[in-house]
Amino acid sequence: MRQGIHPEYHKVIFLDTTTNFKFLSGSTKTSSETMEWEDGNEYPVIRLDISSDSHPFYTGRQKFAAADGRVERFNKKFGLKSSNDNE
């Protein structure tokens, strides 16, 4: 294999922001935010909106996140009423 063309592969902590579930895995993605893992080492943290801990397919039940959808956030940001408010 040619040297210098492949991204650097290292361990990172993936953090599900919905459930605060954390897991350590390998990735080419990196972050400036770090966290100490159970083994005492510091690893970069990648924040996730959804993971196997919070996705309904893997959990077998519906878990509704407290986060608003993109449209609701846009409407709230610009002070607009949503189409559901007219009913």
Curated annotation (Swiss-Prot):
Record Pfam families: Ribosomal_L31
Entry keyword set: Ribonucleoprotein, Ribosomal protein
GO CC term (a single one): ribosome
Gene3D superfamilies noted in UniProt: Ribosomal protein L31 (4.10.830.30)
Gene Ontology molecular-function annotations: structural constituent of ribosome
Cross-referenced InterPro entries: Ribosomal_bL28/bL31-like_sf, Ribosomal_bL31, Ribosomal_bL31_B, Ribosomal_bL31_sf
Signal peptide limits: none
Key word Hydrolase present: no
PANTHER family reported in the protein's UniProt record: 50S RIBOSOMAL PROTEIN L31, CHLOROPLASTIC, LARGE RIBOSOMAL SUBUNIT PROTEIN BL31C
Sequence similarity: Belongs to the bacterial ribosomal protein bL31 family. Type B subfamily.
Name of the protein in question: Large ribosomal subunit protein bL31B
Species this chain originates from: Staphylococcus carnosus (strain TM300)
Gene it is expressed from: rpmE2
